[in-house]
Amino acid sequence: MARILFIDDDQLTLDLFGQILEGAGHEVIMARDGVAGIALYRKHPTDLIITDIKMPVKDGMHVINELMRDFPDAKIIAISGSDREPRREFFFDVSRILGVKRTFHKPIDPEELLRAIRELAPD
């Protein structure tokens, strides 16, 4: 199964999806902000990165930009809990231009996320 780096400032999201992904057989590494997430990826590259867009310290757009610049083959899924659809769609459009493979709006359907993981990081 896949090794996944999950970056989100919301501990509840990390806990919930950590359990779901681990329950599906994936290894999950978690970070609470973009700086920590980038540092973890540099030390321990994973098969897939899931990052929130809006976070303190370093937001998801900066994380995506930096990781895709330094690791152009990285597979990234961007997620957002923004309730402002035009802003969320703008960030998703830009993230896709930067190389993000899939985007999800919170709340995320666990089955849809697991399906995307299977597509992006097959065994």
Tell what function each PLM region has.
Residues 73-86:
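A short, hydrophobic beta-strand element within the central beta-sheet of small alpha/beta folds
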